[in-house]
Amino acid sequence: ALVEKAEIVGTTVSKLTMDPVFDGLTYDMVIFDEVSMAYVPQIIAAGEKATAHLICIGDFKQLPPIAVSAASTVLEKDIFYFLKIWDGTGTAGHPWMTMLDIQYRMHPDLADFASRHMYACMLKTALPVKLSASEKLKNLPWSSSAMVSIDLSGMDCACGFTKSGSRFNMMSGFISLACAMEMSLNGENSVGIITPYAAQARLIHRMIEDLGLKCLPSGEDSGIFCATIHQYQ
């Protein structure tokens, strides 16, 4: 009864399609957030609940959905692919699309890198962020640059594998955590470590705990946090 009477309802797409509480219900507007991670059939199912508007919000260059299925080739194509919003040649456009092309979060150097290599130079940085750029670097061990690459190729640090096939690398984990600790000691309230592999995230998380450091959980604003790319996204 509560869901039927509510003017605004928030739910996951899985619950929307599987929970009988939504049977027969429709809404004037349906907003689908993080749409790049959804299967197209899920978006169609959500759209079926909208009587007037379906708004899809997401990043056409983020990771697509993951599928373990015989139909994975189809399911792993996101809505932006099906609508041909991004054609892979640097052209983005669709009569239905509104692009939010000004970013307010990243250091300008990071945004410029993403803009050049991912968004065909369409991403811009807001002026206040540009003006405070040097302030963002003050607590970094390498305060002259917002972007640093550390080459481990000469350290003989081979990856290990779990039974499920996920990778982990002890040396890489130690160095990543050392960098995070250095930034934390220099005054950064929160430091995030991102890795492609769940096993590596678990390894670094355990290192953080073993060293007695504060492992930043969801909802807190200080400490060191490590997760996979998909978990962050």
What are these regions (language model features)?
Residues S14-L16, P20-Q233:
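Conserved helicase motor core of SF1/SF2 NTP-dependent helicases
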Residues A1-A6, A71:
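Conserved helicase ATPase core
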